[in-house]
Structures are given as C-alpha cells and as structure tokens.
Amino acid sequence: MIEIKVGSRESELARWQARWVIQALEKAWPGLSCRLVTLKTKGDKILDVALARIGDKGLFTKELELALLDGAIDLAVHSMKDMPTTLPEGLVIGAIGPREDPADVLVSPEGYTLATLPIKARVGTSSLRRKAQLAYARPDLELVDLRGNVPTRLAKMERDGLTAIVLAAAGLKRLNHGQVLGEPIPYHICLPAVGQGAIGVEIRAGDRRVAELVAAINHPPTAAAVRAERAYLRALEGGCQVPIAALATVEDTALVLQGMVASLDGREMLRDIASGSTRDPEAAGRELARKLLARGAGEILQEVKAQSGKYQG
C-alpha cells in the first residue's frame, strides 16, 4: 500500500476539490491511500480587506507550496485561478482536472438578471476583473467589496442588503448550491478569470513517483486551455488582482482563446481573440497578449498597477 499526503486549504470548496483529487487518484491506482492535510493560507486569514489591497503573490498558495517543498505533503491541490503564473523553483503543475463551468453567475434572491437589476443596485464582489466588466456593462451599479467562502457570501448578501452578488458557477455547483437562483453572465459581457473552474495539482519537480500517479488524472483539453490562458496572463505580466480575463475553448486539436484587459473603473476595455493548437497552447496565449499590447493594454495595466500601489503602500 502506497500512502501520499494531499495538501489543501481549509475552506469547504478547497476540501471538495481535494476530495475529488483523492477519489480520482485512488480510483486510478487501487493500491494507493491518500491522506488529506489542510492548511490556512494568508488569503484565508485576512477576510476583512479586499484582495487587491493585500497583494496577490501566492495569496492562496504559498503555505501549501512551502509544505510541499519541505516534504510535509506530497502534492498540493489548488484552484488554478489562484495560482501565480510563475511557480516557486522546484515545483511544477503535475495535472489539471476536467474543468467545471467557468462562467460567473449573478445571484439575486429576487431573480434579477444583469439587464433587469434596478438602477444603482448594490452588487457584491471583490474581484477587480468582475467589477471592471460589470461597470462597463452597467456603469450605474454600486459595486460593493465582498469576501469569504460561498456560504459566507450568500449570508452577507442578505445581511448587508445587497441586491445581488457575483460568484463562480464552479463553486456553486461543486458545493451543491446549484439551486441558488442565478443568471450565468454571458461571456461577451463577463469573461472568467484565467484558470477559473479548473483544479490543479502541484508537485515537486523531479518527483517521478508522484508525477506518474497524478498524470493519470490529467485532462488534456483542460490542461491545454489553462496553459494558453496562463501564457497570456504571464505575457501581460498580470496577477490575480488585475482586471484581466481569458477563456480558451478546445475542440479536437484546435484552440480558441478570448481575452480582456480593462481599467479599474471599466471605462477602458480591450477584448480580442487568438487561435492556436493544443500542440502549443502557450503560443496562442502569447499571440493574444501581443495583439492586446499593440492596442494599448500595457498602458491600461500600468495605470492599474499605479492605482493598486496606492492601496498596498
């Protein structure tokens, strides 16, 4: 019997994702036993400050990566949207699981859609990406910072008198909140975060035993899509807390990547598209970044970082 230690954040959604990885591994390798090890990350500890004000380098990953490098765990399970595009030396992505619905969902107890929300409705989200795209589509809305796990955010919606909140469809579905009344926001209005809806497995570089184990649960179409999105984000030198979005779709070996860059207030927005192949998904990411940079994305992001720097001191 082989035993490996699987690292995860402590949140309900993170545990769900880790359990999915454990079940998939134990099904693929009948002689394998996995033990769950949970850790609190910096992002889990600071809940009263908007993410953009904290900084985003490894906000939800660093503690797990340190445990991985120290040998306290054998692999770490992450939401791919939380992972910086550059990993610590000695660590690699060993596998990416099948993607859940990557869309954002507008949740409203009254059943409002983005189009029918009242003028100046209060909508909760802390994501700069979501705020910028919502402000572009509905500049009248009052966008309110909202942090916490899915159940916490749903509770805060009622407590804080919010008309609606925006959540990731993947989290709602994985935690069986699919019955929550919500409208998937169309991609032409709100593109998701890079890697949204995908589960990543991080391992030590050179750990052949664990690499072989996790390779069995890798989903090549999702892995190619996420690699394209991350290459795009890396080429733009963006982090999780900037108004950058992307979504790659894969059919056979063909890959199509959509991307968006916006100012914090949503007044400036650039969108474009690039095509490529699953044989070299990063090339599509770099091409899309090149196209947007040629149209002024660099200047927009420079201004975003200057404004964010004011918050972070």
UniProtKB/Swiss-Prot annotation:
A single GO cellular-component term on record = cytoplasm
Name the Pfam families on file: Porphobil_deam, Porphobil_deamC
EC annotation from Swiss-Prot or TrEMBL: 2.5.1.61
The cross-references to CDD domains, in alphabetical order and at most eight, read: PBP2_EcHMBS_like (cd13646)
Give the gene symbol.
hemC
S-(dipyrrolylmethanemethyl)cysteine modification sites are 240
Q: How does it assemble?
A: Monomer.
Q: What does this protein do?
A: Tetrapolymerization of the monopyrrole PBG into the hydroxymethylbilane pre-uroporphyrinogen in several discrete steps.
**What other facts are recorded?**
The porphobilinogen subunits are added to the dipyrromethane group.
Q: Which pathway or pathways does this protein act in?
A: Porphyrin-containing compound metabolism; protoporphyrin-IX biosynthesis; coproporphyrinogen-III from 5-aminolevulinate: step 2/4
Known catalytic reactions? 4 porphobilinogen + H2O = hydroxymethylbilane + 4 NH4(+)
Family, according to the entry, reads as follows: Belongs to the HMBS family.
Keywords from the UniProt entry: Porphyrin biosynthesis, Transferase
Report what the protein is called: Porphobilinogen deaminase
Q: Which GO terms describe its biological process?
A: protoporphyrinogen IX biosynthetic process
* Cofactors (names): dipyrromethane
Q: Which organism is it from?
A: Moorella thermoacetica (strain ATCC 39073 / JCM 9320)
Task: Mention one GO molecular function.
Answer: hydroxymethylbilane synthase activity
